[in-house]
Amino acid sequence: MAQNDSLIKGWQPVIGLEVHVQLMTNTKLFSPAKNQFGEDANTLVDLIDLGLPGVLPVLNEGAMKQGIKFGLATNAKIAETMIFDRKNYFYPDLPKGYQITQLHYPIVRDGVVEVNGKKIRIHQAHLEEDAGKSIHDKYDDKSVIDLNRSGVPLLEIVSEPDIRSASEAVDYLKKIHQIITYLDISDGNMSQGSMRCDANVSIMKPEDKEFGIRAEIKNINSFKFVEKAINFEIRRQIKILEANGVVEQETRLYDSIKDETRSMRTKEFANDYRYFPCPDLVPTNISKEFIESVRKDMDELPEEKQERFMSTYNLNEYDAGVICADKQIANFFEEVVKDADIQLAAKWIIGDLNALLNKHDINLAESKIDATNFSELIQKITDNTISGKIAKEVLEEIWIT
């Protein structure tokens, strides 16, 4: 925090995040095309995704259920009626010339998440379809379009401007990531674009009554880059204002190589997109009975799992919190302790295993460690077959083989 304090001395950052979460449904939001990552370009495209004349979208009920789950997990208001709108703009990877989204009647409003004891409000979360992907680095002399992503269901989670530092923005983003992965509505893989973040950043003097002019940083795809991009943007705006300049309301892009943001375009307003209700989709009513059926189908939330681990496994609050921070780790722990000492397993997961994951910047599923070999390792430490020092070497050997 000391670094941030010196960075913003005399200035108060004001930050809001828009988090785009790709939902894990079998098919796309309005078409029967498969929702799947990593397939050959333009092989998962339906006529509806292309917006050809005569085709009509049909809402994916699974995506609606996942949006409701997020609303319930964040103590939000679930819409009694949701309406889809057309957001009109031209871009090569948007063949219809509009995006189907929710402006006035989103599925979720007025949620809240707690981050380090502070409540950060969620303005709304709405369903919308993703655009295709423009690829600029495959050929030297041309750009190409992959429409596999076109129509993939997104839940866009819009926070209120309650965040006051880059590090707090990262903590909030990690909390959102934790919620969506615990609910199994998304894998949250930022490197694959399953979770992307836009950051709205402005600065003001602590005594000011109104927020400053904001810049939006688009499509940041890692926790580390979110922090770096916001910190750069704060410094940039401070430099402008302290030179008696004016911060422009604009959209900016973060360059991770140069560690800087650069201007993309003047920031648009809602009127620029000519929103109007989508004539192809009727309003969708959501009954209380339907919401309750979704609630009954929800997985255990992080706080609930942490409480259970404290009571069932006699873990202290800190250990349970660290293990339950990641659903993969929490499930891994429960598999390991079926045959291994609970406290020793917790110690090794929190310490050595997490250290390896952080060192190599991967998650548990991407590693070569599984519950069986880790449990056997803990058992050998427990019965003094091997020492702790040897166990560390064995863990490293498992890791690389």
Residue ranges of model-derived segments:
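Long, charged, helix-rich clamp/arm modules that form nucleic acid-engaging surfaces
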Residues: 245-401
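Basic, nucleic-acid-interacting segments
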Residues: 2-300, 317, 340-342
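Generic N-terminal leader/presequence segments
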Residues: 1-2, 349
